[in-house]
C-alpha cells in the first residue's frame, strides 16, 4: 500500500517537471502553464497535505486511495477554479448599471440646486414687486416714458444710474408701464365701439319702424286714392338721368283728338278740295 502511494506521488511529481522541461526545450511554446496542469498541481499538493494530516490507518489509507483514484487528469478544470479570476472582471451589463446609478445620483444631487435656483428667481420677482419709488423717481420715469416708450441698453443704464436703481428694475418698470398704457387704450377702444353699437342699434330701430309704417300704408286703399300722378313725382339725385318727357302742345293735341259732327239733314258742305255737292238730293 505504501508502495502504491509513493509510486503515485512520484509519478505526479515527475509529470509536472517534465512539462517544464518541454517548455524550456521548445521556446515557441508559451511559458505560462495551462490551466489544466495548474489545477492538477493544486490538486496534488492539496492531496498531499490531506494525507499527511490524516492519521496512518487502514481506513484512512483506503479513503485516500479512493479519493486519489477518483481524480481524472484529462478532465477539464471546473469553473469554480476561476471564480476568483471571474470575480475581478465585471460584465458590460453591470458596468452600464453602475454608470446609470452614478448618473442618477448626480442628477439627484443637482436637482436641489435647480429647485433652489427657481426659488431664488421667485424671490427675485417678489423683491422686484416690492420696489417702492419716490415721487422724483416716478416723475423722471414718466417723463422719459413720454419721450421713449422703449429704451436701448445704453439709455437704460444711464437712467438706472441717474435714479440709483438697477437696470433690471428700470426695464421691469417700462414693461409694466407699456402694459398699463395698452390696457387703457383697449378700454378706450371698447368704450368707443360700445357707443357706436348703441347708435347703430337706435338707427336700426328707427328704420324698422319706418318700414312697418310704409307697409301698413301700402296695404290701405286710401294709398291709391291719394297717390300723385307720375309726372309730379320727384326724382332722387341718383336718378336724375331719367327725365320726364316734355308735354305736347295743347293745339296739336286738341286738333288730333277733335271729332267731326255727322248730321244727315245738314246742308251741303264744301270739300277741302274745292268740289261741292248736294247731300242726299232727290232724283227727278
Swiss-Prot record:
It comes from Arabidopsis thaliana. The keyword Transcription applies. It is found in: Nucleus. Pfam families: HALZ, HD-ZIP_N, Homeodomain. One of its GO terms (biological process) is root development. This is Homeobox-leucine zipper protein HAT4. Changing residue 180 to A: Abolishes DNA-binding. InterPro entries: HD, HD-ZIP_Homeobox_LZ_Class_II, HD-ZIP_N, Homeobox_CS, Homeodomain-like_sf, HTH_motif, Leu_zip_homeo. GO terms for cellular component: nucleus.
Amino acid at each position: 500500500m505504501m508502495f502504491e502511494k509513493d509510486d503515485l506521488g512520484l509519478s505526479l511529481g515527475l509529470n509536472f517537471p517534465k512539462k517544464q522541461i518541454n517548455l524550456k526545450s521548445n521556446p515557441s511554446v508559451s511559458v505560462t502553464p495551462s490551466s489544466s496542469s495548474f489545477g492538477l498541481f493544486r490538486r496534488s499538493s492539496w492531496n498531499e497535505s490531506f494525507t499527511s494530516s490524516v492519521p496512518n490507518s487502514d481506513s484512512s489509507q483506503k479513503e485516500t486511495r479512493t479519493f486519489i483514484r477518483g481524480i481524472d487528469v484529462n478532465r477539464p478544470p471546473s469553473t469554480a477554479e476561476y471564480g476568483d479570476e471571474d470575480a475581478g472582471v465585471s460584465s458590460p451589463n453591470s458596468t452600464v448599471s453602475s454608470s446609470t446609478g452614478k448618473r442618477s445620483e448626480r442628477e439627484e444631487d443637482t436637482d436641489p440646486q435647480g429647485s433652489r435656483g427657481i426659488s431664488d428667481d421667485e424671490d427675485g420677482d417678489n423683491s422686484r414687486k416690492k420696489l417702492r419709488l419716490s415721487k422724483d423717481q416716478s416723475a423722471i420715469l414718466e417723463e422719459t416714458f413720454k419721450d421713449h416708450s422703449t429704451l436701448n441698453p445704453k439709455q437704460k443704464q444711464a437712467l438706472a444710474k441717474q435714479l440709483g436703481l438697477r437696470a433690471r428694475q428700470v426695464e421691469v418698470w417700462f414693461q409694466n408701464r407699456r402694459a398699463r398704457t395698452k390696457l387703457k387704450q383697449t378700454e378706450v377702444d371698447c368704450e368707443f365701439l360700445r357707443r357706436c353699437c348703441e347708435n347703430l342699434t337706435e338707427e336700426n330701430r328707427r328704420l324698422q319702424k319706418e318700414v312697418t309704417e310704409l307697409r301698413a300704408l301700402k296695404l290701405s286703399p286710401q294709398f291709391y286714392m291719394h297717390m300723385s300722378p307720375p309726372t309730379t313725382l320727384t326724382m332722387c339725385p341718383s336718378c336724375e338721368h331719367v327725365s320726364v318727357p316734355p308735354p305736347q302742345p295743347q293745339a296739336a293735341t286738341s286738333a288730333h283728338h277733335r271729332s267731326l259732327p255727322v248730321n244727315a239733314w245738314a246742308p251741303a258742305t264744301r270739300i277741302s278740295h274745292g268740289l261741292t255737292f248736294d247731300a242726299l238730293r232727290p232724283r227727278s
